[in-house]
């Protein structure tokens, strides 16, 4: 079965082995593709790779929180929390002009 997912429906993507799980408000979809593929094909103004295993839709971000001493997590509007690496946090700050 083929599901058409519009960019605005995409909340975030998470890597798991050779697959990427795409999260939308309506459910999860697994795609046999690499994170690098999505990173290069999704619009950089809208999607940021915040961790080696996670790409997030910046329009879905509610806030960025300090998690522990030097770690950050990204809280989405739907309540999901995603860990951000230090490099991912810096990239997110640049893209959001923080």
Question: Model-derived features: where do they sit?
Answer:
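Conserved binding/recognition cores within well-folded domains
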Residues: 1-83
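Eukaryotic intrinsically disordered, low-complexity regulatory linkers and tails enriched in Ser/Thr/Pro
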Residues: 76, 88-98
């Amino acid at each position: 079965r083929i599901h058409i997912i519009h960019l605005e429906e995409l909340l975030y993507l998470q890597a798991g082995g050779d697959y990427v799980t795409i999260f939308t408000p309506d459910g999860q979809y697994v795609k046999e593709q690499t994170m690098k593929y999505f990173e290069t094909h999704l619009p950089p103004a809208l999607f940021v790779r915040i961790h080696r295993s996670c790409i997030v839709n910046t329009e879905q971000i509610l806030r960025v929180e300090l998690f522990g001493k030097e770690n950050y997590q990204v809280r989405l509007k739907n309540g999901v929390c995603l860990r951000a690496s230090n490099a991912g946090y810096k990239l997110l700050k640049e893209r959001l002009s923080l």
